[in-house]
């Protein structure tokens, strides 16, 4: 379960909505990668500098921050080439007529994975989804695994996903998109599979059916498709 007190009863949500004003969805506090990076570095370096005062402090991240930053330096060096490749692959995908499902990944250390899902790691979730897709999805369907924008590259998803897909006989139908525009993908996708990522909200806005693999604050009847994943591949319901 999540720790949210937000109701999950559709009737109760509608009753609350009937008393609320029309929301202003215009961004008030726009963010940026530079701002988020500055906040992250400041937080972690302060923790490192004051470690002698708090020797029992435990990090919430699975990796040491300096190792994480080293991986980010490598990622940033190849960002332009990676973005061009992702957009090219996305354009090719959108030109095809076969239906496809999008699986947006979450970062490996995401507490929503570690504390609010049946998976110990994101890699376990990936293996679960590919196995289900290989066994039960329609033969013409494709699965697009979309990396998280803040993935540090410590795991090579293109290699890992490719190997799992080939081992399960769906190597030609499963692809990894390391970049691209999630909104454009969701607008064309037959469905979105997620553990409990906020990417589910983007899917709602695009009118794309969402299937959850774990608990989430938006796991509400009539909002997400609660069918088993094996059924969702065939009849995704918005």
Feature names for model-found ranges:
Residues 1-238:
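Catalytic-core helical/loop segments in enzymes performing group transfer/polymerization on anionic/lipid-linked
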């Amino acid at each position: 379960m999540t720790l949210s007190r937000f109701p999950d009863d559709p009737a109760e949500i509608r009753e609350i909505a009937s008393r609320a004003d029309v929301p202003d969805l215009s961004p008030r506090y726009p963010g940026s990668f530079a701002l988020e990076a500055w906040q992250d570095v400041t937080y972690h370096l302060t923790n490192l500098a004051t470690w002698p005062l708090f020797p029992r402090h435990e990090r919430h991240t699975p990796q040491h921050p300096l190792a994480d930053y080293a991986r980010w330096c490598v990622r940033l060096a190849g960002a332009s080439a990676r973005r061009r490749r992702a957009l090219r692959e996305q354009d090719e995908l959108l030109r095809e007529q076969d239906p496809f499902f999008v699986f947006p990944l979450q970062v490996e250390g995401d507490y929503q994975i570690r504390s609010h899902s049946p998976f110990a790691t994101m890699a376990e979730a990936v293996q679960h989804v590919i196995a289900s897709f290989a066994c039960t999805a329609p033969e013409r369907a494709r699965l697009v695994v979309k990396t998280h924008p803040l993935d540090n590259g410590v795991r090579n998803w293109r290699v890992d996903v490719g190997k799992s897909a080939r081992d399960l006989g769906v190597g030609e139908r499963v692809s990894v998109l390391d970049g691209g525009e999630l909104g454009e993908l969701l607008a064309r996708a037959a469905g979105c599979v997620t553990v409990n990522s906020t990417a589910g909200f983007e899917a709602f806005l695009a009118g794309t059916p969402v299937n959850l693999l774990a608990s989430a604050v938006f796991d509400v009847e009539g909002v997400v498709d609660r069918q088993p994943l094996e059924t969702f591949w065939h009849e995704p319901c918005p």
